[in-house]
Each structure stands twice: as structure tokens, then as C-alpha cells.
Amino acid sequence: MERVSITERPDWREKAHEYGFNFHTMYGEPYWCEDAYYKLTLAQVEKLEEVTAELHQMCLKVVEKVIASDELMTKFRIPKHTWSFVRQSWLTHQPSLYSRLDLAWDGTGEPKLLENNADTPTSLYEAAFFQWIWLEDQLNAGNLPEGSDQFNSLQEKLIDRFVELREQYGFQLLHLTCCRDTVEDRGTIQYLQDCATEAEIATEFLYIDDIGLGEKGQFTDLQDQVISNLFKLYPWEFMLREMFSTKLEDAGVRWLEPAWKSIISNKALLPLLWEMFPNHPNLLPAYFAEDDHPQMEKYVVKPIFSREGANVSIIENGKTIEAAEGPYGEEGMIVQQFHPLPKFGDSYMLIGSWLVNDQPAGIGIREDRALITQDMSRFYPHIFVE
């Protein structure tokens, strides 16, 4: 795997504006970067595909185990009054759309799973669409090796999945929601709306605080239309604790992502994976912080509900060598053996490996100058060659 410098497209900012990529710069710092790209081999892509598929199936085995155990539901911090709702979502095979595994890998040895973003993964639009446009433009300009391709079937698979949701599950109208003042989330929602529209599903967007509760206990939109199918870019760990959580089970909504995803988007997944698949080559040793576990010289402490690296700390010989602030931690912690992210130049690189409908669908690569990848990371495109 190589990081290769390349000339930026002179008009990429205009293209970003034209295509509605409104978060290519965030907080005054570049997010989308194309002064370089990552070059993989076909064998490396096949390895990522194989590992991603296997890890995902292992995660589904965890759901099966947790659903069947009150003790584990408690350990995963699923509120007791929502157990039936979460369990039924799994037992009735509620469909999912997509997820992203974060992997540490430099192209040699085995990729290591750092975490599973199974509920509200972002960086989708730039991985699925904008880096593909970059590939086409740079190929046409003759700036890439002949025969360059990209590990990226995301858009095609998303549209195909929406067609399945319409034909097999009756998704005629899909509401989509996120929080206000979140330009990246809004961009992700807009992209998914476009994919659903391509699949001939009608869509309606509303902000999460605009969702109402009708007289019959059903959720409604601003036009008092009953919400039957809802894609939410809003975490289950919040929803299961809010006032309306008691209404979830009887509201008759088909959720994307389904409630069973609350189990595998949760860092408690990592210790259970290690317990169920000990010494698996793509896993790192991980344990619940409060449980007895082997001492580790260098490890990472992660809150069960942490997002974007918040409240994650790296410990070496009992001392904190790096830490990120945030609002998480009261829910409990897990510890995971430290595994260094590959370093290219002065930045650390993280691979986000995407799945759509349980199938590997491509990657997005982010860089961060800090060891803990946060929401100010930078996205770089990639290619592969045979």
C-alpha cells in the first residue's frame, strides 16, 4: 500500500459545490483532500473484502448471543424497558441497510478491527460518490496508472438494497431524519435520499425534533402523515433512553438501522467478540474494564457509547499518553490492546470498510495527525491496480 502525491483537479471545489458536497471543509480545515491518494493492489482489496465479510458475520453471532441473555443485555447497557423492542427487531429479521468497520492495516499482515460503526456511519457520500468522480476525472486527465480501479460498489449496492426494501418489505415511502445544524449528517441523508429515489421509493426529510406522536401512538411528520419507514441518522443509545422510548415498540415503524444494531454499534461488542473468537487474527484482545483481565503494557480505553474518538485514551505502562475529551464514559468502559495505526508521512491512516446488505461494498480512507481518529480527520481517495 502506497501514499502517492498527485495534482489536485483545478475545479474540484466547483464540482463539490455543484454536487452538494457542502462539508468538504469543516471548521475552517480541509476535510476532503486530493493532493495524494492511496494505492492498493488487487490482492489487498480481496483481503479487505474477505476480512470484512467474515468480521461482519462474527458480529451477527454476537447479536444472537446478546439477544438471548438478560445478563449481556445489561452489560451492553440496553435499557430494560426496551429489551423486548430490541429483541423483536432481531427475531423478526428487521432489514438493515449499511455499516462500516474501522480497520488498522498497512497492506501487510492481518487487518485489525478497531470498532464497528453499525448504526449511524457517516463519510458515506465521499466514499461512495465523490471519490468515484475523482477517479473518473483523474483517469481522463491521464494522472493515474493505466487500469486503475477503485474498491467501491457502494452506490450500486445502496440502490439495489433500496429496490429490495421496496419490493420485499413494502418500502413505498421512506422518511429520513437527523439532528439540526449537522451539515455532514444532512449531506449523508441527502445522498441516501437520492439513492432511494433512484430505487423508486418516495422520500420525505424532517429533523428529528419535528417528529410527532399521533393519537394512536404512531409517529408522524409535520403534515401529520404516519411514519411507517424511517431512516434515522441518530444513535439508538440516545433513542432508547429518551421520553418516547416507551412508544417505540407499538409505533409500527420499520427502522433503518433496525434496533438490533444498537448491540453491534456498541463498544461492548469488542470484548464479546474476543471471548467468542479468541485469538482470531483480525481481532485485538479486548475486555470489559470492570472484569478481571490480563494486564496489558499498552492499551486503549473506550467508553461503550463513544463516537468520533470522544473520551478515548491510550495508556502505556500505567500512564495516559494520549486522550480525547467528550461527553461519554459514565455508561462504562472497555479496554482494547493498543495496535498502532499505519503512519504515512506525519499522519496516521484508518480504513473504513463498508458493507451494504451484509456485503462488502468498498472503502474510505481517513488520516489524522493524532493517534485517536476524530471528526476532524481528513478523507483521501484511493485506487487499486492489479
Swiss-Prot record:
Site label Transition state stabilizer, positions: R100
Origin superkingdom: Bacteria
Alphabetized InterPro entries for the sequence: GSPS_pre-ATP-grasp-like_dom (IPR005494), PreATP-grasp_dom_sf (IPR016185)
GO molecular-function terms, A-Z: ATP binding; ligase activity; metal ion binding
Record-listed Mg(2+) 1 binding positions: D102, E115
Record: residues binding Mg(2+) 2: E115, N117
Keyword Repressor in record: no
Xref: SUPFAM superfamilies: Glutathione synthetase ATP-binding domain-like (SSF56059), PreATP-grasp domain (SSF52440)
Residues given in the record as ATP binding sites: R100, L101, D102, K267, K302, G309, Q336, L371, I372, T373
EC number: 6.3.1.-
Keyword terms, alphabetized: ATP-binding, Ligase, Magnesium, Metal-binding, Nucleotide-binding
Phenotype caused by lack of the gene: Deletion of this gene does not affect the ability to synthesize glutathionylspermidine. There is no visible differences between wild-type and mutant strain growth in LB media.
Family label: Belongs to the glutathionylspermidine synthase preATP-grasp family.
Role summary: May be a ligase forming an amide bond. Shows ATPase activity. Despite its similarity to the C-terminal synthetase domain of Gss, is not a glutathionylspermidine (Gsp) synthetase. Cannot synthesize Gsp, glutathione (GSH), or GSH intermediates, from GSH and spermidine, cysteine and glutamate, gamma-glutamylcysteine and spermidine, and gamma-glutamylcysteine and glycine. Does not bind to Gsp.
The name this protein goes by in its record: Putative acid--amine ligase YgiC
The organism of origin for this protein: Escherichia coli (strain K12)
Source lineage: Bacteria, Pseudomonadati, Pseudomonadota, Gammaproteobacteria, Enterobacterales
Encoding gene per record: ygiC
